[in-house]
Design a protein with these regions (language model features):
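Conserved HGGG/HGGXW glycine-rich cap/lid loop of the alpha/beta-hydrolase fold
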Residues: 16-74
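Conserved alpha/beta-hydrolase catalytic His-Asp/Glu region
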Residues: 137-141, 153-209
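Acidic catalytic loop of the alpha/beta-hydrolase fold
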Residues: 220-225, 250
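Catalytic histidine neighborhood in serine/cysteine hydrolases
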Residues: 230-251
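Short beta-strand/loop motif that positions the catalytic acidic residue
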Residues: 210, 216-218
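Flexible "cap/lid" loop of the alpha/beta hydrolase fold
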Residues: 111-119, 123-153
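Catalytic histidine-centered segment of alpha/beta-hydrolase-like enzymes
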Residues: 248-261
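Conserved acidic catalytic loop of the alpha/beta-hydrolase fold
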Residues: 83-100
Length: 275
């Protein structure tokens, strides 16, 4: 229902309880389209809070907490895979009665979004990728170093030591403290499963199967992925748009959230009403 902001819960087909937020401040009398917006690894959908005032005025925005993140339960030994994360998106859409929907993701959330669009082209109206190469396998991430560092020091200390790499030009100490505390809520053992799983992913050979309009927003100074690693989208997805954020490191969706949301909104409005 328009003019609302709520946190809700559903049960996936494997029994895991999934949490999701719905924000909708679009005109109640107008046609309604839904955007499913997927957060990055660590933290939860709360990391995308600054996007909501911009996007929810025009779209119903659904933000799931991925498995093991935020208010969603930690998955059991056999309940975490990329296939399962993709299935969660489709089951959430089914739960909400959505035949088709817009889809966007940040970093690891983009990996889930891309897989969903590849496997379910008939369901996805548009796809937006923020700061993700086609999987983490071709990226520059040393996942073993990350996991070992987090296990040895804990999430909070690990993030505090690497915060300058993520946000070299951010001066708001309150934001930096909030980011660390929010991201550090992630279960260490969960990330030790989630991170290496994502590091095995490379969608390059499947990108041609993305049939919907696609937006790629890429950080121009990303230590986790080179420009060449991002350019593969141009080679394999001809119906794509590209925006480079010159000089910015990986965490663009946190450091310049309003800019991200505004660029996404421009893209979505161009395709609104074409379902």
């Amino acid at each position: 229902m328009p003019l609302s902001s709520t946190m809700q819960e559903m049960t996936a087909s494997d029994g895991l309880k999934l949490a999701y937020a719905i924000d909708d401040f679009s005109d109640p009398w107008g046609p309604q389209e839904t955007l499913i917006l997927i957060h990055a690894a660590m933290g939860s959908s709360r990391r995308l809070y600054k996007w909501i005032p911009i996007l929810s005025r025009h779209f119903r925005v659904v933000r799931p907490d991925m498995r093991g993140h935020g208010r969603t339960q930690i998955p059991g030994p056999d309940q975490l895979s990329l296939t399962r994360l993709t299935k969660d998106v489709i089951e959430l859409a089914d739960h909400l009665g959505l035949k088709r929907f817009h889809l966007a993701g940040s970093s690891a959330g983009s990996i889930v979004a891309m897989r969903t669009a590849i496997d379910n082209p008939e369901r996805v109206l548009t796809l937006a990728n923020f700061a993700s190469t086609p999987g983490l396998k071709p990226s520059n991430i040393d996942m073993n170093k990350w996991v070992n560092g987090i296990k040895a020091k804990g999430f909070k200390s690990f993030l505090e030591e690497t915060i300058e790499e993520r946000f070299p030009n951010v001066q708001d100490k309150g934001f930096l403290k909030w980011f660390v505390e929010e991201s550090a809520k992630t279960d260490v053992d969960l990330f030790a499963r989630f991170g290496p799983m994502m590091k095995e992913v490379d969608y390059t050979a499947d990108l041609h199967r993305i049939k919907c309009p696609m937006l790629n927003v890429m950080p121009g100074h990303d230590p986790l992925g080179s420009k060449a690693q991002y350019e593969v989208y141009r080679q394999h997805v001809p119906h794509s748009e590209y925006i480079w954020y010159d000089g910015l490191p990986h965490n663009i969706t946190d450091s310049v959230p309003e800019r991200c949301a505004e660029d996404l909104l421009k893209f979505l409005l161009k395709h609104k009403g074409r379902a």
